[in-house]
Amino acid sequence: MPNDTNGDDYKKLEKASVNLNFLKSNSHTHIGPLSAIAELVDNAYDADARDLHIDFLDINNEQFLELRDDGLGMAREEALHAITFGHSAKCSYKIGRYGNGLKSGAFHLGRELLLVTKKDGIITALLISHRFHEDQGLTNSVFVPCPSFDLDGIPICQTESEKDRFNLEMKIIGKYAPLGSRTLAELADKITGSTGTIIIIGNLRRSVTGELAINTTKDPTDIIVDSGEENKPWRESLRKYLEFIYLKPRMRIHVRGEQVLPKRISENWIAKKQQLISGDQFTAAYNKILDEKNETVKKCEEEKALVMSEIGGTNYTSVRREDRANQKSLRLRVDTSQKNLDSAIADRDAFKKEGKSEKSFHLNMGIETKDRSNNGIHFYINNRLILWGNKEAKFFSKFANSIGISMFLSLDYSLFSAAQNKQGFDHVKDFQVLVRKCNDALRDYSMYLEKSWIPTHLKNTWNVRIYEGDDVWAVLWGVYGYNNTTSTTCVQTHDSARDQVMWTTCGIWKLCQMCRTWIKASRPNEIVGSNDDFFCCENVNHHGCRTIVAEDNDFSKLPEKYDHILPQKRLTNSAPSSSDSQNSIRSASSCSSSSRLLNVAKIESHERIHSSTGGHRLGESFSTTSVKMEPIPNNAHDSHIAEVQRRHSTGRAISPAVSEISRRAGTAPSSQLDMIMGEESDESQEALTIRAPRQRAKRPIERVSRRNRRDQSDDDSDSENEERYATAPKKSKVKGKAVVRAPKMTREKWLEEMLNQFLTAHGEQPLPKNGQRDFDPTNIVEQTSRRNFKNNQRIVDAQQAIMRQIGSVLDHLKRNPTHNFKIPASGTVEEKLKNIEHQIKGKKK
């Protein structure tokens, strides 16, 4: 800029209350670019904007961020208040409270800020430029050009000094503002409505390598930052972050030309419960806000007194015309200051009255079923996200099955105040107390789920029952498509039947683009034209917005008392309970971490030729869907032909696979496990049976001498007693009758024994003692199945040989009507056929 402007001329400009160094340090309150952009988004939200457009522009090799909204806009006085650090005239229900977001957010992203706003037919521009201050050597103060003009471009000026200031401001903006190749008038034309605001940030922040701090090339419809947390997309993607930033998204947000589709935080939650918490003990935020409001009233009083002192007792008839114009301007300032004072007093009094009322809030809890690793506690203050997925509560570190369990809180600013960057809480002690209350509620909630809700839900919704020893969490996650209970990387399997149940349980939530209300449908076909960009209430009820009741709160109260649903007992009593079988098998066999279940593989259909007496025609196929687990010895194929046929024809066969739900949950049903482990054979082998000792009532012990005992018995018993006493070891005292009990066996020992029988039956070596072994049960069963198939094939070969023999006889009889064959009167059919075949071959020779 040519040095044709004196330093004194800059005194005509508006001046901020801080210096340039504070402006730089204040920008570091944000943890990253997404946090800074969110601050600017909050300003549009608080201005009741319906639409916000966030764009990245590259004009003449200059990069800019542009945010354009159709909110209330600002007059010149309101725009100047924006550069007063720490000032905020927003109501208590608004998101922004510190009056600092515009400056801190903008200068975290870049070094040049241009604001253009429109209200009441007046356009106002405001520029804060680092480059301008550095070029002019202005480091002690922040000078802010802030010209105003009407829709025709005519400046709003009352005096000659105001005109001079306007010209100077336009000159500085023309040189230092981040306009690119555009003019200020062209930029103002982009505000098409009667009100609105445009924020342009230039000279964007770069890394030490010269690259932009934001990535705009990875996704043309998004703004990406490198946070180093790939498993948390809301830390890297502006679009993902904005999907959850507001509980009630009243404003449409467009990022680089494409609308952000908000997500309802609990749309995929089940078991939605809430607990009411009193806020009486949280007073730090209230006291701080009250002090701020008292300070605002005091400043307004001082401002009014200052203006009144400038007016004094001047007589309008004794001054010049220009002085009278200045006096008129002062009178307007008095009116404005009085309005500000009245507004501040009314706001403070309303806040006091509201503070006397009882404060409470809800802890909303549920189980996330679609993205269960994206759980934790989500804190919102005044409808705005503060912390997402917080896991400071001990519940998440001490409770193994905490994955998927989530909670969100919608807090009021009068109880809790956010930090300046809205990435945490302002009062640490209050936050710690709040976390402890959340921890207690989550502990009660998980107990309720495990003891009551999950068993009832599985029975009523999925027709799945819980048996003694079953891991209810494993069964629950199994039916919802997760084969691992605690892994955060486990991916949910897709199932259309499960989707149908989810639609009924959770509903399908859509945000109306007209009234911005969440609408719930239970089936996809209830929604006509399901394009989210244009969805409105009319797509559901065909009558217009708000004609149906939206279920904004579908959480019920967490019961303090509830019925404990006891697990059912298993039908089998021949062995210890096989619940927790998966974990027990792992410990007994020291298997690898693959955690494969002992499932019987499903055997594919094979071709089988039955004899005429078997009820099947020659060449007819049959399907084998199950197979006995014990292999048929290779050296006894012929002796087992009838047995194999009997086993295939009867229903006494092992189920081809463990129940799908139990397989996903990580446990096998007791009946299936018993069949796999115990029912090795119907006739050839005896299953190992260990019966629990019968409980007997204790009897008083009689001390009977050996002689008397012999006298009380007959001769036969005497001989038996003599033989028994002759062989039994001598004891000093006999206190009671010895009871022969079955040897006790722990669950691990029993499972190991069953597993060894399983391996031995399939021709495998048993588990080594005090050793480890890795094996694949599915592969073992498949090998046995292949051997059984070979045995079946031998049957088929024998039948085919018989058919060939019969064919030879029939062919010969057809060619020779008369024959002199000697057909044996006795013998099997096979022997008779062989005899006739030998006779035929002898005649041929």
From Swiss-Prot:
Keywords assigned by UniProt? Answer: ATP-binding, Coiled coil, Hydrolase, Magnesium, Metal-binding, Nucleotide-binding, Nucleus, RNA-mediated gene silencing
Span list, region Disordered: 566-590, 628-739
**Protein's GO biological process:** DNA topological change; regulatory ncRNA-mediated gene silencing
EC number assigned by the record: 3.6.1.-
InterPro entries on file = HATPase_C_sf
**Which Gene3D superfamilies did the record assign?**
Histidine kinase-like ATPase, C-terminal domain
Which regions form coiled coils? 284-311
Q: What is this protein called?
A: ATPase morc-1
Gene designation: morc-1
